[in-house]
Design a protein with these regions (language model features):
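Tandem CBS (Cystathionine beta-synthase) repeat/Bateman regulatory domains
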Residues: 1-322
Length: 322
């Protein structure tokens, strides 16, 4: 990866892509999992002999295409199960266009290349969302101080509060509140397993239900949560056998819960820097939904931008295949 240069405002480079973990196609899935665990990453880029992007491999791929399919991680190479020739953004791509694409296509990760097709890094939409929220919170704090100062002047001099300031502060406040967790409810119950369920069976259920997390129950009560990232870090990287290892050994116990009226931004803030997902409860103490870091910014993103190119493909002007 080349040294970073000053990022033009409004571009993908300004989003500060993270350094990409890179591996070769002939690496076994077991070896890749160990590397991902050592680096605490859930996504790697696969590069060819010229160090150009040949594919992308994620924790979800390992859970769905390897463990969930009953394939042994030590017997299969990354090349056999990676997503080949992934869509990539260029460093000078519009940041808005790149994020819109990630939301529209359901990508959590998007590789970034420079004008010479060398790897510049990788975008993680959850990190982008956290960064945007921090900027919005700083803007709100500054605007609120100005609002309070003007309110003090109004009290002393009897003047009315400038409508522009009132409108600006209110607009930022509304953006920060955003949609609630209830808005992402699908009406479908969360996927559950027992403490005795094997990792292989849990991964197969994830694949079947198109989810990256399952709730673990013991005698009718939720006792833990198990995710695709756990499959990588706690099972395959540790050399455990998914067919004989029960989820109770490798789950995250006592997951956090949140009410359905919590805002998506608040939920993301609650999960920031933590490996667990959050389960939400309805008014009758019923588990309504389990969701991870990715679907939340996706849902919030849909609230902010519903643009679509009309044909479901990205404009070649700003995105390209590796």
């Amino acid at each position: 990866m080349r040294p970073s240069k000053k990022a033009p405002p409004g571009t993908v480079l300004a989003l500060k892509p993270s350094p990409a973990l890179q591996i070769k196609p002939n690496t076994t899935v077991a070896e890749a999992a160990q590397l991902m665990a050592a680096k605490r990453e859930d996504c790697v880029l696969v590069t060819d002999d010229d160090d150009r992007i040949a594919g992308i491999f994620t924790a979800k791929d390992l859970a769905f295409r390897v463990v969930g399919a009953g394939v042994k991680a030590r017997d299969v190479t990354i090349e056999e199960i990676m997503t080949k020739n992934p869509l990539c953004a260029k460093t000078d791509t519009s940041a808005t266009d790149a994020l819109d694409l990630m939301v529209r296509k359901g990508f959590r990760h998007l590789p970034v290349m420079d004008e010479n097709h060398d790897i510049s890094g990788i975008l993680d939409i959850t990190k982008c969302f956290y960064d945007a929220m921090e900027k919005l919170e700083r803007a709100y704090s500054s605007s609120r101080k100005l609002y309070d100062a003007l309110e003090g002047v109004q009290a002393e001099m009897g003047s009315s509060q400038p409508q522009q300031i009132i409108s600006y502060v209110e607009a930022i406040r509304q953006k920060m509140s955003g949609p609630t967790l209830e808005s992402v409810l699908t009406g479908l119950p969360p996927v559950t397993v027992s403490v005795r369920t094997s990792v292989k069976e849990a991964a197969a259920l994830m694949k079947e239900n198109h989810t990256t997390a399952v709730l673990v129950q013991d005698q009718g009560s939720i006792t833990g949560i198990f995710t695709s990232k756990d499959v990588v870090l706690r099972v395959i990287a540790a050399g455990l056998d998914p067919a004989t290892c029960s989820v109770v050994r490798v789950m995250t116990p006592h997951p956090d819960f949140a009410p359905m009226d919590m805002s998506i931004q608040s939920a993301l803030r609650k999960m920031h820097g933590r490996p667990t997902f959050v389960a939400w409860w309805g008014d009758n103490a019923e588990c309504m939904l389990t969701i991870g870091r990715w679907p939340l910014p996706e849902s919030a993103g849909h609230e902010r931008s519903r643009r679509d190119c009309g044909h479901g493909r990205c404009p070649e002007a700003y995105l390209c295949h590796a």
